[in-house]
Amino acid sequence: PYRRQRQMCIRDSNLPGLVIDIYAKTAVMQAHSAGMHVDRMVIAEALSEVMGDKIENIYYKSETTLPFKADLFPENGFLKGGSSDNIAQEYGLKFHVDWLKGQKTGFFVDQRENRSLLERYAKDRSVLNMFCYTGGFSFYAMRGGAKLVHSVDSSSKAIDLTNKNVELNFPGDPRHEAYAEDAFKYLDRMGDQYDLIVLDPPAFAKHKDALRNALQGYRKLNAKAFEKIKPGGILFTFSCSQVVTKDNFRTAVFTAAAMSGRSVRILHQLTQPADHPVNIYHPEGEYLKGLVLYVE
């Protein structure tokens, strides 16, 4: 199934290993299995038939996602069209989507409902968006009435993209500042000026052998946030690691809260949206876990 939006995502458990995200009139297709790669042109033709004139371009991006043992050596490139127009909309906000060189298909569509939720909590708050990438959470916070928003990412390219997106949505707005800096170093040096913090790191573990270190990383990261956030603050914290279960993540976060000595209450338990369906026989498909926490 697919969901019609200006920015949308097609992920069907009956087509394992296939991801299609649609940004305005461009579909970005990604194969994670050899079978999907082999049938990429058939899939592109079927997508064109179903979507009609709603899409004009299909970009194939699988150089880094196919199994190495398959020895397929795919090349990224357009299967249809070739437009360089990369601006998409999400709930009224505009974003430059870097599907050529960006992470995944260029944007994290799986967080859109969680970004929208954050907007409701942002009014008059000082917001820190860690691992900001394109700045998605930051702009929802700004639209929600945040007093100030700081976006942090270790990648200078991500910060450049965030700043471009600021100019698309809030040109010249003095409330926003962006920093290219390691997350842990930033948390170490920052004061207690924030009362809403977003922790949305990249996957800390992509295989089970890395699980133990990943959980240590989540504990350390969240403990820093609990230590620094203002009393009465709101923490949005996430894990997108498939091998980290919901219980694993909750235990890591709750342990971090205990380590910090802060009293914490759960406001929301978050996951991916309906167009990222989870097959009940493949629970690992529920890769996105999130908590919204009130920190006393």
Give the positions of each predicted feature.
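Conserved SAM-binding loop of SAM-dependent methyltransferases across substrates and taxa
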Residues: 134-146
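Single conserved hydrophobic/aromatic residue that forms the stacking wall/gate
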Residues: 1-10
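S-adenosyl-L-methionine
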Residues: 157-198
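C-terminal catalytic and target-recognition region of SAM-dependent MTase-like enzymes
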Residues: 234-296
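Conserved SAM-binding motif I beta-strand of class I
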Residues: 148-153
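Conserved class I S-adenosyl-L-methionine
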Residues: 124-133
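Non-catalytic substrate-recognition/targeting regions of SAM-dependent transferases
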Residues: 11-21, 37-108, 116
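Mobile active-site "lid"/loop adjacent to the S-adenosyl-L-methionine
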Residues: 194-224
